[in-house]
A protein has these predicted regions:
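Secondary-structure end/capping motifs
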Residues: 227-312
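Bacterial N-terminal signal peptides
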Residues: 9-19
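Bacterial N-terminal signal peptides that target proteins for export
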Residues: 1-10
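Conserved C-terminal helix/tail region of periplasmic/extracytoplasmic solute-binding proteins
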Residues: 300-335
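Sec/Tat signal peptide C-region and signal peptidase I cleavage site
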Residues: 19-25
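Short, glycine-/small- and polar/acidic-enriched structural segments
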Residues: 26-159, 164-167, 183-189
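Ligand-binding "clamshell"
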Residues: 27-29, 93-105, 194-208, 267, ...
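Pocket-lining segment of extracytoplasmic ligand-binding domains
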Residues: 172-264
Length: 335
């Protein structure tokens, strides 16, 4: 199966069941929130200590996923009402395919925590990246890692069409790289840490940023849920912002770290090192021009163009401005 057919299959799948979006939890006294394991964030302290339920007055079912593409499908089916830290590329793929989702806040920025790793035995670095031509690579299609992979290969002049690209979740890619089953693997979080044990990156986070490879995740939700439950969503975002502020105060980190690590399924050292590479923009920063005030929308247009030019999606939206809804985040400022 080709890159395009796999990604379009996922997009078509969410489009076919998009009508189910409205069938969210009746009355919303109970909702389901998607998140990632091995992706430690301050919100997990609030998750584990009941802060969300207390603020929202609703029961929350937390379900872990292995990719943002899977999150989109779950929101389309009505099984998930909010996704925390969904990558921008899978979001762009979903809305470009007709799914009515909206970004409601910037969850995290992490240029150093999403990358591709080349098997150490190949002895390939950025000076010899052209030798990757024809190699086998594990990539979670439709994700931030996929976008970064395409941009890096374009930068190095490597024809992706001539590579053997295999769709693998990051954890699977890390295992395949360690076993010598692939020459390169792309991913994030704990899986990326394991990949680095078997190889080396080509570009640092700073070098990727210079190429325009921005890496950030968003909190997303079906537009129907945002319209129906704006107040509930604002309360969710307020708790998230409070948890981020708590983590920013080093005095709180000793009590928060063990809780976050346990929920993320990681040890405390790995959790601390991963969090050190994360940036959690404040509410005011998120609403500024660099993020939801226009920068994110422009970036999504660029992501769509890369996917369109590479044949991974059939069409892009004329504008992605309508896929961002800042009303709930604006409400947080008044809380």
């Amino acid at each position: 199966m080709t890159l395009k057919s796999k990604l379009l299959g996922a997009v078509a799948g969410v489009a076919m069941i998009a009508g189910g979006q409205a069938a969210t939890a009746g009355g919303h006294s109970e909702i389901t929130v998607a998140y990632f394991l091995e992706w430690p964030m301050p919100f997990q302290f609030a998750k584990e200590t009941g802060m969300y339920e207390e603020a929202m007055g609703a029961k929350i079912n937390w379900v872990s996923f292995d990719s943002g593409v899977a999150m989109s499908a779950a929101m389309a089916s009505g099984d998930v009402q909010i996704s925390v830290s969904q990558g921008v590329p899978p979001f762009v793929g979903a809305v470009s395919g007709g799914q009515d989702l909206q970004i409601v806040d910037v969850a995290v920025s992490y240029s150093d925590n999403d990358n591709c790793v080349v098997a150490s035995g190949l002895e390939i670095d950025k000076m010899s990246a052209g030798e990757l031509a024809g190699k086998k690579v594990a990539v979670p299609l439709g994700t931030a890692a996929h976008y970064g992979f395409l941009k890096q290969m374009s930068h190095f002049g490597v024809d992706v069409g001539g590579m053997d690209v295999v769709d693998m979740a990051p954890a699977e890619g890390a295992a395949a790289l360690s076993q010598g089953a692939v020459d390169m693997a792309c991913g994030w979080g704990g899986a990326l840490r394991r990949m680095k044990e078997s190889g080396n990156i080509l570009l640092t986070g700073a070098e990727k940023s210079e190429l325009g490879i921005l890496v950030f995740d968003a909190t997303t939700a079906p537009a129907a849920f945002v319209a129906e439950e704006g107040e509930m969503l604002a309360k969710f975002l307020k708790v998230t912002a409070d948890a981020n502020a708590m983590w920013a105060d080093e005095a709180n980190q000793a009590k928060m770290l063990p809780v976050i690590a346990k929920d993320a399924g990681m040890d405390e050292t790995a959790t601390s090192e991963t969090l050190a590479g994360f940036i959690f923009p404040s509410v005011d920063e998120q609403l500024g021009a660099a993020w939801l005030g226009g920068g994110a929308q422009d970036f999504m247009g660029g992501v769509a163009k890369v996917f369109l030019d590479s044949g991974n999606i059939d069409a892009a939206l004329d504008s992605y401005a309508g896929t961002v809804n800042t009303a709930p985040l604006m409400a947080v400022k008044g809380m």
